[in-house]
Amino acid sequence: MDERRSKPRLNVSLDAVWHGETGRQSARVTDLSEGGCYLDTVGEVMKGEIVAFRILLPDDDDWLYLEGEVRHHRPGFGFGVQFVDLNEEQTDKLSMLLRLANESGPEPFAISADLVEE
């Protein structure tokens, strides 16, 4: 685990859509914790930028809407965010996702979806 992180991240594979200064982009969340996540995407961001994104939740066609501050990025590969201003509903949904990912064992916990604009 990276020493900069205060919370351990779990290996996941979750479809996501994010919005930043460059517009709407598709992504895949590849690790997730209570404090942040990593998004695999070719879209460009700047360190410190606030991005809004959504992650598909299992079984009920519901989305988890989040905002995060870009903490690091690898141009053309993706970026890591630290969540900002989580409310109780977001925290509950995030906890549910983390519990499911933890129960899935060593294989990445995966949810895929058609990424259409709502």
Residue ranges and their predicted role:
Residues 1-32, 95, 99-118:
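N-terminal helix initiation/capping motif
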Residues 6, 12, 43-47, 81-99:
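Short solvent-exposed strand/turn elements
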Residues 12-54, 78-80:
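Short strand-loop-strand
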Residues 18, 31, 70-72, 85:
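A residue-level detector for short acidic-glycine micro-motifs
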Residues 24-26, 61-65:
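Short, mixed charged/polar active-site loops
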Residues 37, 51, 64, 90-95:
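A short, polar/proline- and glycine-enriched secondary-structure boundary/capping micro-motif
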Residues 56-60:
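Short, charged beta-turn/beta-strand-edge "cap" motif at the junction between a beta-strand
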Residues 66-76:
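Short, compositionally biased
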